[in-house]
């Protein structure tokens, strides 16, 4: 993060447009520098840092224009460094043949490839918050595990969790049933040091484990197939159906950014696991701000990018659409006129719900996009959605999917969850 600042000498003097913004991100960044001039020794910290956010606060003083010298600022050269990890990975020992591997959406920062390799060697059922990165994951686990009966039938001996699970209460309820929990997350060495588990690893360990028994695998397959049958039978242009169809029809080799709140949870639950798509999401504070800008930044490095946003996420970052770069990104905006996730939570129906939680805006996202010079259309059917996903992504476009009301969606989800008790 680069921030522009007034000279330090003006701080705490009441000077205009001057505030305390040094170390504004606190311990959330790996490195901070308060840069007070063109000569600053940044090569050393840049070469030695682990991956993570960096904050450079750059002080600007008069004169604002360069002098007569053509080269008034030396180039910063950051050479690639190779660090040898002298510590051998620890070994994970387990006699369990009824184990489960649970993979959080961000994988604790570990690469998809390394986690896939680990999962294949382990040979346990996989629950993945990002089913588009793990084709061997159990389909729709967060849906059928809403049933307490099914959770009781699938109590594991051991669960291994990679990263953090932040999307579904059903998955977290399932995790609590396991007598032994193993956590793998590099962030425990930095920002997540209080994480509780029976065993903790900050890197993928060497495995000394047993494969899952055939009977255990068959149990998971049974519930996944029964749940998939129910999901395949869903009709209409609902948020669940949209998530299912987006996952199934994204072009091979495309990139997907998915916003927080309901979109990422619907994809987790209703998408059929597959490969061929590179997925991204903001799972730090999981906010709805900055999602357009994040998607466009990702699209700069991708051939064709799709971004799935809720209407509030879209409205909170409209200025991100003001750009001068050539970017290929198709935004699919799920429009239910407000914060749909809150209608699925216990506070639904309390006094003042709409003004505090629902926050309806009564705006037309497509009209707003057009006013900003962006190509925009509105769709209301699965066929139109499939057509959108098959079309080449050229430039920036907005496709607004108008869906049933937030209450209707919440009732539909509740009915789906309740039906899991009888599959």
Question: Which role does the model predict for each range below?
Answer:
Residues 2-28, 271-423:
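Thiamine diphosphate
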Residues 35-38, 57-60, 102-108, 129-131, ...:
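Structural motif
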């Amino acid at each position: 993060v680069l921030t522009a600042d007034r000279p330090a000498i003006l701080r705490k003097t009441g000077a205009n447009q001057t505030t305390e913004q040094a170390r504004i991100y606190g311990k959330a960044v790996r490195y901070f520098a308060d840069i007070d001039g063109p000569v600053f020794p940044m090569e050393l910290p840049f070469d030695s840092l682990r991956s993570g956010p960096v904050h450079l606060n750059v002080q600007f003083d008069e004169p604002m224009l360069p002098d007569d010298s053509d080269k008034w600022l030396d180039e910063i050269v950051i050479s690639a460094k190779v660090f040898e990890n002298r510590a051998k990975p620890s070994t994970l020992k387990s006699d369990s043949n009824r184990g489960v591997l649970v993979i959080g959406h961000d994988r604790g920062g570990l690469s998809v490839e390394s986690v896939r390799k680990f999962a294949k060697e382990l040979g346990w059922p996989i629950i993945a918050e990002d089913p588009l990165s793990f084709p061997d994951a159990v389909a729709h686990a967060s849906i059928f595990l809403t049933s307490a009966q099914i959770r009781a039938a699938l109590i594991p001996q051991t669960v291994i969790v990679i990263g953090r699970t932040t999307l579904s209460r059903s998955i977290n309820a399932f995790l609590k049933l396991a007598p032994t929990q193993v956590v793998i997350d590099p962030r425990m060495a930095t920002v997540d040091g209080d994480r509780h588990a029976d065993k903790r690893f900050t890197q993928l360990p060497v495995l000394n484990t047993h494969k899952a028994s055939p009977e255990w695998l068959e149990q998971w397959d049974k519930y996944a197939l029964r749940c998939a049958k129910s999901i395949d039978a869903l009709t209409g242009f609902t948020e669940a159906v949209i998530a299912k169809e987006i996952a199934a029809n994204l072009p091979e080799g495309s990139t997907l950014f998915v916003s927080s709140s309901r979109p990422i949870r619907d994809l987790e639950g209703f998408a059929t696991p597959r490969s061929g798509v590179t997925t991204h999401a903001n799972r730090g504070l999981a906010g709805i701000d900055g999602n357009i800008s994040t998607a466009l930044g990702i699209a700069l490095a991708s051939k064709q990018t799709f971004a799935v946003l809720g209407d509030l996420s879209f409205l909170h970052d409209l200025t991100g659409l003001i750009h001068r770069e050539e970017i290929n990104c198709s935004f699919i905006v799920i429009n239910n006129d407000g914060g749909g996730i809150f209608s699925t939570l216990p506070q639904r129906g309390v006094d003042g719900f709409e003004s505090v939680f629902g926050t309806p805006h009564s705006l037309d996202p497509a009209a707003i996009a057009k006013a900003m010079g962006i190509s925009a259309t509105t769709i209301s059917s699965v066929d139109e959605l499939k057509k959108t996903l098959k079309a080449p992504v050229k430039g920036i476009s907005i496709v607004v999917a108008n869906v049933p009301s937030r209450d209707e969606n919440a009732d539909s989800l509740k009915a789906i969850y309740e039906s899991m008790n009888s599959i």
